[in-house]
């Protein structure tokens, strides 16, 4: 269940950032909708690059340690993203969060399959069901944003990142 929630939360982070980065850019920098939409492209470009770089790094670094470092950097970067107002810093932090979150799905999925290899079909199906995280987290973000503001909605993603950071240490203990 812990890993299922991890998949749910990492997908929720991806979808949540995809929908809110443009709003964040418009609110903090005064960008137009068409300009701010490029923020999502920046995030997913960083994720793509991070996936390729991660493939090489994961061949040399233990995946639990890699995830711990990634989540630590992602959490710090995301907290800074909530408080900075500069277009340059927002852009840099969007890239940092994209790079550091890029390999989390595959690490969690791999650990889940290794946990009970004799039940890999069931485990795989459960993990893929976690992809619904984008459909669950984003509406909750919307409710929080409407009630308390943009930063409150984004704070839900911070809670997701904190959970992922916590499970990165739990994965190390399972070995």
Mark where each language-model region is.
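Intracellular juxtamembrane helix-capping segments at the cytosolic ends
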Residues: 102-117
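A membrane-interface helix-boundary motif in multi-pass transporters
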Residues: 140-161
């Amino acid at each position: 269940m812990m890993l299922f929630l991890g998949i749910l939360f990492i997908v929720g982070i991806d979808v949540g950032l995809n929908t809110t980065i443009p709003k964040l850019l418009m609110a903090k920098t005064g960008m137009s909708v068409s300009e701010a939409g490029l923020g999502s492209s920046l995030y997913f470009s960083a994720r793509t690059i991070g996936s390729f770089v991660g493939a090489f790094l994961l061949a040399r670094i233990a995946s639990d340690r890699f995830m711990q470092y990634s989540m630590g950097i992602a959490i710090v970067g995301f907290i800074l993203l909530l408080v900075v107002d500069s277009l340059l810093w927002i852009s840099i932090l969007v890239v940092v969060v994209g790079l550091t979150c890029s390999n989390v799905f595959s690490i969690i999925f791999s650990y889940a399959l290794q946990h009970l290899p004799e039940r890999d079909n069931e485990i795989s199906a459960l993990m893929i069901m976690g992809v619904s995280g984008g459909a669950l987290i984003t509406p909750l973000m919307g409710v929080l944003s409407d009630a308390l503001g943009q930063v409150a909605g984004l704070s839900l993603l911070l809670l997701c990142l904190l959970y992922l950071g916590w499970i990165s240490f739990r994965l190390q203990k399972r070995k």
